[in-house]
């Protein structure tokens, strides 16, 4: 019998695309909201408020990435258990994961409230926006529990093959947030505090809605008394996935921060060009990023169900889809780089336009590299090897940072070296990830999926792989 959200049956290509589209729509919706929120704050309150919200957003992303990493890691475990048809284990994992991430959320909230002022001073927030940023963050972090609840249940529903429901609740949240922004800022004149309150109310609505939906509509995910016990094996498995996913997210943010610092050293023109180009860049590769996340859930469910042949066919299908889509996007970005930059830059800002166009044409040629890398991230998370995803992230961003600083220091190369370091990092990580897939990962996955050990220590796996490679 085909279960709702079951990715272990049906046509592979159709299943992958149908599961990806709502996730992609959600990401696009979130990006559109970010742009709309920026415009409302900037146009209706002023430049200082815009700077405060922008700076606060960077800090929020870093802190909330901890919760996102925990939810993503838990989602992989949920997918494995759902694919295996072990609903009892799934419910126990839901309970343990909820307690774990809920506890981290509370501790994070307490830490922010206790050390918000020292954090802002460490970030060297200018005096003229200090109070604005502090007030905004103080209100926002009262609602962090809603961020936890929405992301937890969204990850759970996606893990069991439902990527549509989280999209609907996100859409309601975005529309409500924009409406409340306009009402609280324009009508009630609440300023930046009104923007923060609007965000918290919208997040609370989405969190409450998705929680009630899961409880009422998905009875197989509803916890029973016997499920509410602290299972150490579930905690160990969830922690191993979630911790590594958090490390991956932190490494990504830190690497991006270091490159941003180098870009800033070249002055405001380069900073402006980079800021505009990165917005276009993130939109361009967003589809392959979401496809990689959908692919991870597909692999995890089939890995849990021990459907090795379907996994292999899924890998081939996913790579083909990624290649075709990446090439199309590469062509569009390469040939329309200048018109795309003109969305954010005035025609008379010739130098900004030139630098941004150069960036997009260099990155655009290599979108296949980032597309494959997202597939590799998702694949290794799904087959119980999240550590390999971390290794590839460190390799990609480490290469980017080292090459950026080295190439940018050469006068004849300069800032262009930063642009080239990014795809070089992607391609190097791709090469390592694909070689590992060919020579090691398939053997390791086969050992685990055939019950050699449910979750053996990595050293044991690698030792067995080493022995299997000997002549």
Q: What residue ranges belong to the model's regions?
A:
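Short runs within selected transmembrane alpha-helices of multi-pass transporters and secretion channels
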Residues: 71, 140-158, 166-174, 195-208, ...
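Small-residue-rich hydrophobic transmembrane alpha-helices
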Residues: 50-110, 147-166, 273-337, 370-384, ...
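N-terminal transmembrane alpha-helices
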Residues: 7-45, 58-73, 77, 102-109, ...
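Helix-terminus/linker motif at the lipid-water interface of multi-pass membrane proteins
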Residues: 28, 32-50, 120-127, 183-190, ...
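Transmembrane helical elements of multi-pass membrane transporters/channels
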Residues: 18-37, 139, 150, 173, ...
